[in-house]
């Protein structure tokens, strides 16, 4: 990662708090993510990971705090501005969100819809250059030979790779991936994480990914941010972060008050 990439802030969250009625889902979470970083939000189900992602793209309005993406304040911008900003924010879902009856190529092309003037009447047609771009993205994820196959005939790992190709077709500045490997076997999980990592390196894209698998986080992330009960427990470079330190977020709150020295108050 170059110094220039490190200097460019793509995402900044300042004391983000989110309540759903009486339930506190996020408690004053702050973080900064730079261009070309792959940052993993790690924690158990209910720790606030997915809620935080949806605060980043404005799907969940924050209760208090501030979210800035690519220079735009998501929490205070007009709705039309936030909708336009979402064109620059790709989202990779746990359950793929593909149209099963469509081919892989047609699903990837959907990622470029925002760049087209939609016809009032008649069928939607894609320019040759867009179709070539979509095939190139499928080739990048290793599925160009399946371009015309229906996505509902693919394995889970293949479907997630199509979903990543669709996200790349969007030409995003930020990619949010919500538990993208939760339903995959270990081999396919590694393939998907490798794709996300290569996107960061080769395209200078920023990826924020939620996971609950410690080994995947340590193996692929530039930084790991641990969440527990809606609070940030640590924010550390993955290099040098031990598995034992990370496992602190899976312990009960009363136990983790006496966490290892690496997670003492000064390191949180």
UniProtKB/Swiss-Prot annotation:
For molecular function, the Gene Ontology terms on record are: ABC-type phosphonate transporter activity; ATP binding; ATP hydrolysis activity
Q: How does it sit in the membrane?
A: Peripheral membrane protein
The protein's location, in the record's own words, is: Cell membrane
**Would the keyword DNA repair be found if you checked this record's keyword annotation?**
no
Q: Which UniProt keywords apply?
A: ATP-binding, Cell membrane, Membrane, Nucleotide-binding, Phosphonate transport, Translocase, Transport
The reactions it catalyses are:
phosphonate(out) + ATP + H2O = phosphonate(in) + ADP + phosphate + H(+)
What is the documented function of this protein? Answer: Part of the ABC transporter complex PhnCDE involved in phosphonates import. Responsible for energy coupling to the transport system.
In its UniProt entry, what is this protein called?
Phosphonates import ATP-binding protein PhnC
- What is the species of this protein? Nocardia farcinica (strain IFM 10152)
Lineage here is: Bacteria, Bacillati, Actinomycetota, Actinomycetes, Mycobacteriales
